[in-house]
UniProtKB/Swiss-Prot annotation:
Physiological role: Prevents the cell division inhibition by proteins MinC and MinD at internal division sites while permitting inhibition at polar sites. This ensures cell division at the proper site by restricting the formation of a division septum at the midpoint of the long axis of the cell.
Family that this chain belongs to: Belongs to the MinE family.
InterPro entries: MinE, MinE_sf
Database matches in NCBIfam families: minE (TIGR01215), PRK00296.1 (NF001422)
Protein name in the entry: Cell division topological specificity factor
Organism: Methylorubrum populi (strain ATCC BAA-705 / NCIMB 13946 / BJ001) (Methylobacterium populi)
Pfam family, one: MinE
Keywords: Cell cycle, Cell division
UniProt keyword annotation of Cell division present: yes
Length: 98
């Protein structure tokens, strides 16, 4: 970039493009924040269904949290198992080795 280009006033198209990019980024961030509860509810139900195959767990004892950071998302799952549920867990069928 030369000095003349640097000092030249920017055109309206580049200013409009930057404004549009800011608006789109804001809308995407807003949509992803409001869309997360649906994802968390779906994940919670699927996780509960998988766990129910092995152990009986009260649905209100499962907490799921989704955190988004820069370039990475973290899914946290906290499940409170009753002591007797672990001892009564359905045993996994063993495969015969041929």
């Amino acid at each position: 970039m030369s000095v003349l280009t640097f000092l030249k006033p920017r055109g309206s198209s580049s200013v409009a493009r930057e404004r549009l990019q800011l608006i789109l980024a804001h809308e995407r961030a807003e949509r992803s924040e409001t869309g997360r509860p649906d994802l968390i509810i779906t994940l919670r139900e699927e996780i509960l269904n998988v766990i129910a195959k092995h152990v009986t767990v009260e649905r209100d004892k499962v907490q799921i949290k989704l955190e988004r950071g820069e370039g990475v998302s973290t899914l946290g799952v906290d499940i409170e198992f009753p002591v007797d549920a672990i001892s009564k867990a359905k045993p996994k069928a063993k495969r015969a080795i041929a």
